[in-house]
Amino acid sequence: MAVVKTKPTSAGRRHVVKVVSDELHKGRPYDGLLEKKSKSGGRNNNGRITTRHVGGGHRQHYRVVDFKRNKDGIAATVERLEYDPNRSANIALLKYLDGERRYIIAPRGVKVGDSLESGVNAAIKRGNALPLRNIPVGSTVHCIELKPGKGAQIARSAGASAQLVAREGNYATVRLRSGEMRKILAECRATLGEVGNSEHSLRQLGKAGAKRWRGVRPTVRGVAMNPVDHPHGGGEGRTSGGRHPVSPWGIPTKGHKTRKNKRTDKLIVRRRKAK
C-alpha cells in the first residue's frame, strides 16, 4: 500500500493524495453478498431533513459483512481483498471449506491465501475471532462485540484497534484508542490484530467534487445564515455570532458533553482522554 501525491496538472489535482493498493481485487464484488442500497437524501418519511449534509453521490451496493464471525470450527481461506465504498476499511472475501463465502473487515497483514477461523478453539493468530475469555491479556484486538452474538460494534474503521488489558470474573477490560477503558462481557467476541488500511487517514480528496461523489453536501456556517435559520445568524455586516458556538438547535457545540447513557456508566472504568 502506497501513498501517492498527484502532479498538479489541474486545480482539482493539485492537492490530491491517494492511497494506492496493488493487492485489492480489480473486478466486480461477489454478487451473492450484495444488497440494494437506496438513498434518502437525509430525509425522513415526512420528507423533512433529519440528517444534514447528506445527498447525491455515486450509486452503491451494500456489501454484507459478517460481524458475528459465528461459523465455528470450519477453516476459511482469504480469497481476495476488496475495496468497500461503505466504510473506510477494506474487506476480505473468505471461502470456507464447506463452500460458503463471507465478507469480513480485512485485518492488517492478512494476505490472499491465508487461513482464518473462528470459535473457542481457534488459534491465537491475526485475523481469527475468539471470545475475549480465550484471548491472552495484552493482545491487540478489533471488531469487538458489546453483547454476545450481536456482532462487532467497536474498533471497525480503518487502522482501529483496542488492547485487552485485564480479565476478571465475567468481564474483560479493554483499552480503546480514545483512552477509554471499558468492561465488556468475556463471552463477547473480538478479532485478533488491528484493522488494515491505516493509511486512509493520510488521503486528501483535493476538491469539493470528490466529496460530492461520496454523497456529502456542503456545510454552511451559522454566521452566514439568517436569524430564523441559526442562533448565529443575522447582524449588520460580518459578525462573530455574538455567543459561544452552538448548533442550529442551540446546543453548545465545542466541548459540551452529550453522553446520556447512565445504564452503561458502571462499565466505563476510565473516561476517554480530554481533547
Curated annotation (Swiss-Prot):
The UniProt record lists the keyword Ribonucleoprotein: yes
Biological process (GO), any one: cytoplasmic translation
Compositional bias of kind Basic residues: 254-275
Bias kind Basic and acidic residues: ranges: 28-38
Keyword check for Chloroplast: no
GO molecular function: rRNA binding; structural constituent of ribosome; transferase activity
Protein keywords: Ribonucleoprotein, Ribosomal protein, RNA-binding, rRNA-binding
GO cellular component: large ribosomal subunit
Region (Disordered) location: 28-58, 223-275
UniProt record similarity statement: Belongs to the universal ribosomal protein uL2 family.
Function description: One of the primary rRNA binding proteins. Required for association of the 30S and 50S subunits to form the 70S ribosome, for tRNA binding and peptide bond formation. It has been suggested to have peptidyltransferase activity; this is somewhat controversial. Makes several contacts with the 16S rRNA in the 70S ribosome.
Oligomer and partners: Part of the 50S ribosomal subunit. Forms a bridge to the 30S subunit in the 70S ribosome.
Protein name: Large ribosomal subunit protein uL2
